[in-house]
Amino acid sequence: FENGHFTDVARNIYLLTKFGNNYKATAMFCGNYITAKSIVLPNSKVFLLEDNGSAALLDNDATLLWSGELKYRGGAAADIALYKNTLWASFPECNVLLRYNLSTMREELRIGGNKSPFSRPEGLFVEGDSVMVCNSGSSKLIQVDLNSYSVFEYEDFEEPIHQYVQVGDCRFAVLDSGLYLI
């Protein structure tokens, strides 16, 4: 996006970017490689999350190391993000963010719940020591400081926000009506 124009991307380049060097074998673990969420970890392992909450951790040669579910009170995780050595997941049905230990895949911390600052949290984007949380229920982008766990309203939209990302100086948001450069 350096020149301000979008460019078509070949399937293999998309898969390489999403799943890492062993993208062909890794993509075979996905029911739908387009909708599956993935994180290529610093050690080249890949964490996968399907829409139904099914999750897998694959070695760099696509060997299955762990499989299970990312669910909270019956609701599937909507998105995942990596911060340091932990995995964060959003659960829109419960208004919760959970932090998991990547070594044990055990829940370590919960933010939100009954009196939650979140309203249907979906997309997560880690930026420095903060995670940006897309609240589709309140149409707000929320910033969570990952050192103090303080929660701040960052930006308000006129319709639900589902995904947010920053690339260089450009910020993008996926709203109900489409993709926007903000």
What are these regions (language model features)?
Residues 1, 6-10, 48-52, 89-94, ...:
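Conserved beta-strand positions in repeat-built beta-propeller and related beta-rich domains
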Residues 1, 33-40, 74-82, 118-127, ...:
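Repeated scaffold domains used in trafficking and secretory/extracellular systems
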Residues 3-30, 36:
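An edge-strand/N-cap motif at the start of beta-rich repeat modules
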Residues 14, 56, 98, 140-142, ...:
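WD40 beta-propeller blade core
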Residues 17-21, 59-63, 101-105, 145-149:
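Short loop/turn segments that connect beta-strands within beta-propeller blades
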Residues 23-30, 63-71, 106-115, 150-155:
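A short beta-strand motif characteristic of beta-propeller blades
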Residues 109-125, 135:
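Eukaryotic tandem repeat interaction scaffolds
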